[in-house]
């Protein structure tokens, strides 16, 4: 899952 702040920063550190 690639979202951003919504996603878990630990799992998906994408902004």
UniProtKB/Swiss-Prot annotation:
* Tissue specificity field: Expressed by the venom gland.
Q: Which UniProt keywords apply?
A: Blood coagulation cascade activating toxin, Disulfide bond, Glycoprotein, Hemostasis impairing toxin, Hydrolase, Protease, Secreted, Serine protease, Sialic acid, Toxin
**Mechanisms controlling activity:** Inhibited PMSF, benzamidine, leupeptin, and Cu(2+).
Q: What is its EC number?
A: 3.4.21.-
UniProt-listed GO biological process terms? proteolysis
Carries keyword Secreted?
Answer: yes
| Recorded GO MF terms | serine-type peptidase activity; toxin activity
Q: What range(s) does the Peptidase S1 domain occupy?
A: 1-15
Entry PTM: N-glycosylated. Contains sialic acid residues.
Q: Please give the GO cellular component terms listed in this UniProt entry.
A: extracellular region
Chief location category = secreted
Subcellular location(s): the record lists:
Secreted
Enzyme class at the top of the EC tree: hydrolase
Similarity comment text for this entry:
Belongs to the peptidase S1 family. Snake venom subfamily.
Summary of subunit composition and partner proteins: Monomer.
Question: Any idea what job this protein has?
Answer: Thrombin-like enzyme that has high clotting activity upon bovine and human plasma. Also has fibrinogenoltic activity by rapidly hydrolyzing Aalpha chain of fibrinogen (FGA), and partially consumes Bbeta chain (FGB). When administered intraperitoneally in mice, causes defibrinogenation, making the plasma incoagulable.
- Tell me what else is known: Negative results: does not act on the gamma chain of fibrinogen. Does not act upon factor Xa (F10) and plasmin substrates. Does not induce hemorrhage, myotoxicity or edema.
Name the chain's protein.
Thrombin-like enzyme BpSP-1
Q: Which organism's genome codes for this protein?
A: Bothrops pauloensis
Q: The organism's lineage?
A: Eukaryota, Metazoa, Chordata, Craniata, Vertebrata
């Amino acid at each position: 899952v690639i979202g951003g702040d919504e996603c878990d920063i630990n799992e998906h550190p994408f902004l």
